[in-house]
Amino acid sequence: MTGATQAKLWYSWWLELPLPKEHLTVMQFLRTLARFFVAVQLLPALEGGEETLVGGQAVLEGVMMRSPHAWAIACRKPSGEVSTHSEPLERLSEKHKWMGWPVLRGVMTLGHAMTLGFRALKFSANVALDELQSPAEEGAPQKKKLEISGWIAAVNIVFSVGFFIFMYKFLPLLATTELKRVNPVFGQQVVFNLVDGLIRLALFLLFIWGTSLWKDIRRVYQYHGAEHKTVFAFEDGNSLDTATVQGYSTYHPRCGTSFLMTVMIISIFVYMLFPVTTFWARFAIRIVLLPVITGLSYEIIRFAAKHRGSLFALMTAPGLWLQRITTQPPEDAQAECAIVALDHAMSLEKQRGGELVIA
């Protein structure tokens, strides 16, 4: 047995450890929080990378779908029932024209998508927690509802931002700086930023691969595949039934995974344009330029989607390859959740006077 196989078995065993019955509810609550935290880290990879006609996101045991003016979420309860929720949605580029400007629109779209995605994840986590709570006996005081409270969500956001900065900004920069001390060749502007980018990419791929070993997150990746299949069926104008949806691919060019990979690649070249030499100056540049890199990556994704044979389209190819991990073939019940979510979003869209036409 190889070391990698042993590590995978140990990791899977630890995450799926059988629990004593008397501690089951508490530990399931903590496990749900852990799933919620990991899913928040994966949020950009699970989200769509554009403000499109129809898009979506995988959540815990469910799928969120959005149309131009509505969004809906469908989550599978442990009982087998599907819990749904839908709300109207304002399209940013229609509300504020300046939000549709090139580069800036990418930053605003991602921020809006992340906010909506976090709300969807919180809803799905609360659905899972609701099933853990047994009903109060007749005459007994009402039990406090198990849910992701405001302070838990706030701590999660702060921790997630800190994790992102430490994992993908601080650590690669620190490692490359230490390599520069070992060999001066790593101090050259091009070499330094190239190595820094490769380390950052390696950490990202390691994180994605590591999360895929956890059964709960593998199911999130299956729902991600269900979301892609359903969007493909809708874009082709086909009926939204399980058999039809299952006939489509799980790999979608506008996936957030492709967007993240583009961000990783573009950042290498952008950092090369700023010849700062001290550690903290380089670190500051990486934080300050994050919105610019996000906006540029968004424009490249848009251009590549319209010009499939261009050089920019090749830059999005690694994201499609990575979807072999972040999307998995869904079960019929998972595809059904994606269909229900899209149906609810479409119904609300029509109620608000919207009309979706596939050209």
Enumerate the predicted regions with their spans.
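Select subsegments of transmembrane alpha-helices in polytopic membrane proteins
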Residues: G150-Y168, H252-V263
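Tryptophan (W) side chains
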Residues: W10-W14
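Hydrophobic alpha-helical membrane-embedded segments
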Residues: A70, W98-F123, D196-Y221, I293-K306
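Polar-ligand-bearing catalytic/cofactor-coordination segments
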Residues: A34, A45-G55, V59, V63-M65, ...
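Membrane-interface starts of transmembrane alpha-helices
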Residues: I148-N156, P184-I199, T278-I285, L289, ...
